[in-house]
């Protein structure tokens, strides 16, 4: 993927200098302190500092000055900045024209280990996610190593797909799709999972719409396209269930199968057309 390193995006909140979330600085009882000490000994991590309220969160938009960053991570921050700005610039142009509404920018929060979000605690183990309550995407950059090593989806465009998918969820929020789906899930809980799958597949397609924009500008080649398709398929529910040693149970899918995710990403990538991303048609 062709991209140009530049300044960190103004839409990024860099919290990597913070060890974890604060809990209002409330005093901790002796029992709680003992529990944190035990957890620290068991997991070999400093839970005392993390949860005692003594750690300050890095100021919005910048990392702690004391943080030492290796060159590879610096490059990764520049890369996600480029992808974020490019994706949002694309939606600045596409959404008013094809969706009939102006696009408003999401924020991207970079963190290590854990941080607070309006949707609850964001943790490394959770993976990247979009929180509609604060309109922010949360990513621990360490996930990209996992994408390569655990899920077998290396490459910069594969990494870009992950962020573009989460921005796709923000597009759904701006269009009012997310709130409608949530209301339907509340009214009929039996449809919660199928509706979730449709929402996720649509976000895959929206990521593809941005991918089409990069292709039009010769920022990606065929090998990049293949990497993006592999990334979409790598996180299908059926594959994740097999990796966890469980039987494949479509009734428990929340994101769609590998084949479905790859298919919808390719649909957006091939068309570049928002109208082609209607995963709710015929419902």
Explain the meaning of each model-derived region.
Residues 6-19, 25-254, 263, 270-283:
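A Zn2+-metalloprotease active-site environment signal
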Residues 260:
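Short alpha-helical
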């Amino acid at each position: 993927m062709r991209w140009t390193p530049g300044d960190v995006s103004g839409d990024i909140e860099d919290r990597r200098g913070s060890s974890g979330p604060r809990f209002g600085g409330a005093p901790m009882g002796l029992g709680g302190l003992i529990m944190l000490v035990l957890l620290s000994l068991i997991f070999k991590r400093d839970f005392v500092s993390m949860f005692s309220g003594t750690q300050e969160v890095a100021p919005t938009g910048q990392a702690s000055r004391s943080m030492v960053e290796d060159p590879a991570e610096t490059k990764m921050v520049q890369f996600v900045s480029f992808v974020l700005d490019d994706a949002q610039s694309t939606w600045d142009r596409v959404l008013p024209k094809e969706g009939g509404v102006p696009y408003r920018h999401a924020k991207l929060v970079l963190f290590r280990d854990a941080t607070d979000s309006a949707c609850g605690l964001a943790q490394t183990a959770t993976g990247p996610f979009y929180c509609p309550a604060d309109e922010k995407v949360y990513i621990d950059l360490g996930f990209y190593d996992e994408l390569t090593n655990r899920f077998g989806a290396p490459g910069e465009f594969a990494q870009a797909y992950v962020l573009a998918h989460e921005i796709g969820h923000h597009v759904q929020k701006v269009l009012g799709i997310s709130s409608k789906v949530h209301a339907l899930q509340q009214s009929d809980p039996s449809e919660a999972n199928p509706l979730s799958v449709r929402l996720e597949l649509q976000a895959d397609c929206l990521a593809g719409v941005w991918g089409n924009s990069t292709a039009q500008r010769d920022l990606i080649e065929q090998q990049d396209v293949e990497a993006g398709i592999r990334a979409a398929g790598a996180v299908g529910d059926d594959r994740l269930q097999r990796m966890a040693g469980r039987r494949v149970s479509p009734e428990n899918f929340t994101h769609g199968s590998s084949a479905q995710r790859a298919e919808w990403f390719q649909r957006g990538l091939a068309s570049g057309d928002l109208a082609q991303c209607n995963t709710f048609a015929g419902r």
